[in-house]
Structure formats: C-alpha cells, structure tokens
Amino acid sequence: WLKGCMDYCKRFYSYNEFYIESSLTVSKTDIQSRLINLVKAYLVVRIKGQADVPHWARTTLKLLKLEKKYRAVILPAKENTIGMLQKIQHYISWQEIDTKTAKELLDKKGRRTGYKKITTEDISEAGFKTIDELATSLSEGKISMTKIKPLKPWFALSPPRHGFKRSTKHLYGQKGILGYNKELSALVRRMM
C-alpha cells in the first residue's frame, strides 16, 4: 500500500513539475513592471474615515496626501506607489486616470493656497499654458501634484450624489468599491 502511494506521489509531482516548467510563469514583480510601463498615473480616492486606522496605514495615507475622507490625488505610477496602494487598499480606491477626468478635477475641484479656485495666472505661474496642458501632463505621469507650487496637492470631494451603489466595506472583487476599482471615474464624477 505504501509503495503504491509513493508511486502515485512520484507521478503526480513529476507531472506538476513538467506542467509548471512548460507553462508560462510570470512573477509578481514582472507583472508590476509591465503595469508601470502601461499605466502612467493613478487617481486615488480615500473612502474610509479617520477612526480605527492603524498607525502604519495613517502614515502611508499621510505620505500620499490623503489625510481626510473623500480626498483625491493624482499619483504618477511607480513601483513604490503600487506597493503603497496595495498596502492601504482597505481604506482607498484607485484607477488609472485619463486626461478628461484630470481636466474635470482641475476645473471643478482644483484649489490653490487660501482654498481659492484655480485661475489662468496660477497655471501660468506653474509653468503651463492652459489647464488642458496641465491635465495632460498629470495624466501621463510627467509631473506630480506636489511639484506644482501654487496648487493644493489634493482635491476635496463630497460624498457621491445618489449614494454608493456598492459596499464601502469590501474590495471591488467582493462587490465593494475599495482597492483597484474599474468604475472609479464614474464615481468621482458624481462626487464633484
């Protein structure tokens, strides 16, 4: 009986090793580096509030300028950025950003020091000709919001009109909105 089990185990493991070696194996770092090459910038929104947040998550959220609920930032895609987003995925939601969404955020919710609306003088002071040029450079990941000096590095959003359609306590794959969310741009448009 024992010999039969050993033979079965040898055949099973040799088959699996052959299957694994012959199939395409991709590591997690390969996938992340390929994503960074495809994605230029992320739109990140903090969904959960400040209560019961552990210190490690609070410091990561502070580094990303997401200190309050319903704040949004545009982050250039880097390896450390993806790691930070995955670390605090139970408090935020993120998606790749396009130029149209970046322009809408800058038009409606962009603020400068003193919490005043952005003017053309502020954009020219930042080194851009138009708001479209600024939105394009942000969505392509060429510049970070923290580098544009008269502008605030975050956007203060309101709760979405007509409420959340999915749960705010679960990840996107579990019928929630947290973590990587494919429908975040539509949600952000309802929050502007």
Descriptions of predicted regions:
Residues Y13-M192:
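Core subunits and conserved enzymes of cellular information-processing
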